[in-house]
Amino acid sequence: MSTTSTTPQTAPRRATITDVAREAGTGKTSISRYLNGEMSVLSPDLRARIEAAIARLDYQPNQMARGLKRGRNRLIGMLLADLTNPYTVEVLQGVEAACHALGLMPLICHAANEVEMERRYLQLLTTYRVEGVIVNALGVREETLRPVVGSGIPAVLVDRLVDGLVADMVGLDNRAAAELGTRHLLESGFDEIWFAVQPFEQVSSRQLREAAFREAMGAQAGQAGQAGQVGQGGKGRARGHTLVLNLADTAEVERSLAELDRAIDAATNAGHSGRGGNLANPGGAARPAAPHSRRIALFAANAPVALCLALHLKARYGADWQSRVALLSIDDPDWAELTGVTTIRQPTYEIGYRAVEFLHERIEGVQTAARDCLLPGELIVRASTSR
């Protein structure tokens, strides 16, 4: 019977600036000057010895310590509400590219749509002495950001304004995007349009989209009334509704979707004889809309809402659910192209890149009034709304 004994292995000690100085036969001051690029004060022979010592010892400078000594660490914080949202991931790609180009290092904080977690992360970022903060959060308020901006740390907001906070903001032109989508649905001849949005009381981007939808619907109603016009087939002006989908509460989602189901059935089954009410086809295929039914469309305020609607409609009406109801979404997730859903594509990469550029300018001391950079969305028309 043999036994083996193991001795805990200790990781090799990292070389320090003192080790490099000893190896190069000089003092720590000369090493610091070399690391800081002050080559003019070092002789060619000394520079060569220091370079060789660094290579032999595999010395890696402590960038955080060096940055703190200079008062700069090139670290910026980014507070994100929902990293599972494709929009956030795409914005983050632009952030990372800009950070790489500008020599910054992003510290990502994912709050998972929890307001208390957002507050804690903001407090934590101040202890890391970040040079700036980019905020795309759910419930951040001015008093939450006050410790950050009050300590002289610049902040840039992504897509969402914060009441009472004067700061740069980069994002989609939400009003224009919602108007663009609503006009497309109206011009496509839909008689009934439901704008589906998550709770919007505390999120400015959702507020702007919902308000723009209502205003666009009201404007077409006024224009049609003044001109004495009616919709296609003499059915009258299009009707608009707002449906709140609280994706964080399953019971509330079910109640909201039940309301939507009743509206879809009432609109699309109007011309069918026989039983009314819920006519979802148990065989897995949607019954086509009746010849004299009202054409109904759903306008999702973002990709998570659109996905919730699409999955529900497929489960209820079958794979051919789009023969019964159209779907348009702000955001253009990959699955939208596969299913033929019309979207309004956001310039997500540009939003992230521009946010870092704004923040970098503030870090470097640019003093201007707060800036809003509103970027246009692009309407991508697919089969869902062109049938």
Please tell me what each predicted stretch does.
Residues 1-73:
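N-terminal helix-turn-helix DNA-binding module of bacterial transcription factors
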Residues 44-48, 57-132, 199, 211-214:
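Amphipathic helical "hinge" segments at domain boundaries
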Residues 49, 87-101, 177-181, 204-222, ...:
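Short, solvent-exposed amphipathic alpha-helices that sit
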Residues 106-127, 178, 242-271, 282-291, ...:
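Structural motif
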Residues 113, 136-180, 200, 304, ...:
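Flexible loop/hinge segments that line or gate small-molecule binding clefts
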Residues 170-195, 252-263, 346-364:
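Hydrophobic alpha-helical segments within soluble ligand-binding/sensing domains
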Residues 179-220, 231-235, 239-242, 371-386:
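An alpha-beta-alpha
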Residues 265, 270-387:
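Flexible loop/turn connectors
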